[in-house]
Regions:
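Active-site and NAD+-binding cores of ADP-ribose-processing enzymes
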Residues: 1-13, 40-195
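Short, well-ordered beta-strand elements within core beta-sheets of diverse protein domains
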Residues: 17-24
């Protein structure tokens, strides 16, 4: 109901109906959901679990949490080591080719593309997750959220179904925003919680 989506959310502007859920261990997800709602003492909340609909089981989510425990130095070292291994391998093949046939074949560096893509994806995800996803402290949510909203629209345009991201208000929590609010349905009973 568009009457209830009148405020900016991290990934969606007013009027856009996307589904925001806390994910992971049920106890952690419950705590995360309450913190995301900015629950205050005396408020009553209803929480339930959701299940991804079968139509969406093959859809791909962008996971911005994939590299949270990886250091930039480790990512760079892995890429450098891979490049060194490939260089040594291709130089050896070239020398062997020249010795046997008098010429060297064009080097095969196709596997560096996979290594570089992984490095770029992890570096980008870590950058977004660790340095950008901080709680918004300003009242101007439109200004603070607009980069995230543009990014979400970009991922949507590429065919992704949503984004997994770390909670900014609960360090142990993870959330998902699904670009189709009907991608998941409630299951089980609604648990009433008096904060």
């Amino acid at each position: 109901n568009k009457d209830y989506i009148t405020k900016h959310n991290r990934f969606s502007p007013p009027g856009v109906e996307w589904l925001y859920l806390a994910i992971g261990d049920p106890c952690v997800a419950e705590t995360c959901a309450l913190k995301e709602c900015r629950a205050e003492a005396g408020e009553l909340f209803g929480l339930c679990q959701f299940k991804l609909n079968e139509d969406y089981s093959e859809k791909t989510l962008v996971d911005l949490t994939i590299a949270e425990d990886v250091l930039y130095e480790d990512l760079n070292r892995q890429l450098e080591n891979s490049a060194d291994e490939i260089r040594k391998r291709e130089v050896k093949k070239a020398v062997d080719g020249i010795m046997r046939k008098g010429y060297a074949k064009t080097p095969d560096v196709s596997d560096i593309k996979e290594k570089f893509t992984r490095w770029a994806a992890y570096t980008y995800a870590r950058l977004l997750s660790k340095q950008i996803f901080v709680p918004v402290e300003t009242e101007d949510k439109e200004l603070m959220y607009s980069p995230f909203q543009c990014m979400a629209q970009y991922f949507l345009s590429l065919g992704y179904a949503g984004i997994i991201y770390s909670s900014t208000v609960f360090s142990e929590g993870k959330n998902v925003v699904l670009f189709d609010k009907d991608a998941a349905t409630p299951m089980g009973k609604i648990k009433k919680i008096n904060v």
